[in-house]
Amino acid sequence: MWNKDKMGAVLLAAGYSSRMVKCKSLLPLGGLRVIERGINTFRQAGIMDITVVVGHRADKLIPILDELKVSYVFNEKYSEGMFSSIVKGVQSLPAETKAFFLLPSDMPLVKSHTVRLLGRAFNKVKADIIYPVFQKHRGHPPLISANCFPEILLGNTSGGLRQILERREGNAYEVEVFDEGILLDIDTHEDYQKIMTGYYRRDIPTQAECEAIFKKMNVSEAIVNHGRMVAEIARNLALRLNEIGLNIDVHAVTAAGKLHDLAKGKPNHAQIGGRILKKYGYYKVAQIVAAHTDMELNEKALPDEAAVVYLADKLVKGGGIVSIDERFSASMDEYAASAEAVAVIRERRLRAEKIEQTVEQLLGISLVMAARDLC
């Protein structure tokens, strides 16, 4: 748990959206509007004191904000630029506010877990500014302490908020996050398309997020390389299965293949890895990772994402492709002295052989030969 008391959020939605025909805040995204996604991010993190600064096209935004029961303030100086909206937003904050999150309304992919991480850091370190960082790049929303409010409210700096925050760099703190959304905004139609793609894959880490997770958790190079090989086999198996009419999520199996041994070395590493990914909001991939050692197998069902990753993992040992027999014979030899371990290995082998048989029948190929061709 973390102390959300006296923390607020300011969303900036007063600008012109000059490079877009439509108001960016009102663009549709997953059945809601872009601005609703940002509001929901804070609400899901437990931040309820939210103010939206409106200006250009306020007449379109205000009815929606009323419907959402979100506070708003009108910036009559919106033509002067973003800093005027920031000043207006800070003016609207309750006097007892300790800090506020600042988010442009056209950044709808920020994860609620990122907001929680920033809040926890603020409670711990008491910095003037807490920045989320992804792959060494600072993004939004920064969490800005009340210590900065007087200088912001003067509103007379030519350098805007950036200049104010730069003067306080000595008391800034960075929080590394697995959230590429902190860097993604909507400036162009191409950006909007990327945002839409990211939204529909929001429970699947991007390639960059996978690499950030590896780095943060100090995953060994051997495990990273194993994961990349499993991911490549899983991806190509999924593509081939989809060609004959299945509907395997290629992006999900690729990410899960990479990350399946994230917690390798810990007891019940599959379940632990799944819990870690679930905590960061990657629910779909978390389920696949959690099942990669032991999964429920419906022999009458067609292979799904979990089955594809389970099988791909069993076809890789060390840095090479092996058969199911080779993979499990080595394990049987290693744990021959433990009857309990041997029973578990036999169960896993039987499961892998059944999946392999189903896939080979569907594709009409030898899976080991295909795997060697695919890598």
Predicted regions and their residues:
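Conserved donor nucleotide-binding strand/loop of the catalytic core
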Residues: E67-E80
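Divalent metal-dependent catalytic cores for phosphoryl transfer on phosphate-bearing substrates
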Residues: A238, E243-Y335
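Conserved beta-loop-beta/alpha segment of the NTase-like Rossmann-fold superfamily
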Residues: S79-E151
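N-terminal glycine-rich phosphate-binding loop and ensuing alpha1 helix
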Residues: K4-G55, D59
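Charged phosphate-binding loop/patch that engages nucleotide di/tri-phosphates or the phosphate backbone
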Residues: D185, T197, A341-C375
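A short, N-terminal amphipathic alpha-helix
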Residues: V34-D49, K88-S92, I233-R240
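Active-site flanking loop/helix segments enriched in acidic
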Residues: Q207-G227, L241, A256-L262
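Conserved alpha/beta core of the MobA/IspD/sugar-nucleotide pyrophosphorylase nucleotidyltransferase superfamily
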Residues: W2-D5, N156-A208
